[in-house]
Amino acid sequence: MTPEQSPLGKPSSYTEQYDASLLFPIARKNARDQIGIGATLPFFGTDIWNAYELSWLNARGKPQIAIATFYVPADSPNIVESKSFKLYLGSFAQSSFDSIDVVRDTIKRDVSAACGSSVSLHLYPPAEFSKLGLEEFEGTSLDRLDLDAEVYQPDASILKAALDEAPVEETLFSNLLKSNCPVTGQPDWGSVQIHYVGPQIDHAALLRYIISYRNHTGFHEQCVEKIFLDVMKVCQPVKLAVYARYTRRGGLDINPFRTNFNLPMPDNLRTARQ
């Protein structure tokens, strides 16, 4: 299935009765073909989805709520189109379930089937909301730099690194990431963290490169994977991890993480803009 066939950008009817058929899978291969990623992935990682608008009825008809966090493996054959995900979660609103465990197991089964891979899921009931505090990316902020920018489509040639000097290890981040939905054209606002070991990357060049996504159209996952590929190709780090946190739309935020070395999966930190 393609993004153009999805509910994204089209009028939709909202059902409040549970319906697993609302989930619309999109093959990762289509977007990866566009940026030159073949069957052997140059990274591993996960997409962290947070859903803030989940509610259902208990066996006595009383509404229940929870925040859901999903971990979708980067090697899953499919992602789920975000509007269909919203419609699917909304279909729980007037459906009765015996317990939160049944809700979790139902969602995990359906989303795993749509993605074609086992998806991890945690539901946070209100008693656990205090665990979900605000945090910001660790590292050195690139946004401190006072510079000119004039390129607003991704251009890997902007990147620079000290290829002839001793390797360094750095963690850098920017809150100036912006791209646009390829179907609706709506802006996607985000923050991105880059952790690497290798030739030192020119900070100003990296910030200009991040800014260059401003008029780019691409899904969140594809943008992060393109950043990963471009930094690997031009800057030649030995180790690289790219982690983006996008602001929510339709009660969902999507946060892709890609790395080529053995790191634990990142914390699901919630930034101030999320």
Curated annotation (Swiss-Prot):
It is an enzyme of class 1 (oxidoreductase). InterPro entries: GTP-CH-I_C/QueF, NADPH_dep_7-cyano-7-deazaG_red, QueF, QueF_N, QueF_type2. Its main location: cytoplasm. Substrate binds at residues 80-82, 220-221. Coiled coil: none annotated. GO terms for cellular component: cytoplasm. Pathway: tRNA modification; tRNA-queuosine biosynthesis. The active site is at 181 (thioimide intermediate), 188 (proton donor). Its EC number is 1.7.1.13. GO terms for biological process: queuosine biosynthetic process; tRNA modification. Keywords: Cytoplasm, NADP, Oxidoreductase, Queuosine biosynthesis. It is found in: Cytoplasm. Pfam families: QueF, QueF_N. Gene3D superfamilies: 3.30.1130.10. GO terms for molecular function: preQ1 synthase activity. NADPH binds at residues 82-83, 249-250. It catalyses: 7-aminomethyl-7-carbaguanine + 2 NADP(+) = 7-cyano-7-deazaguanine + 2 NADPH + 3 H(+). Catalyzes the NADPH-dependent reduction of 7-cyano-7-deazaguanine (preQ0) to 7-aminomethyl-7-deazaguanine (preQ1). HAMAP family: QueF_type2. Homodimer. Belongs to the GTP cyclohydrolase I family. QueF type 2 subfamily. This is NADPH-dependent 7-cyano-7-deazaguanine reductase.
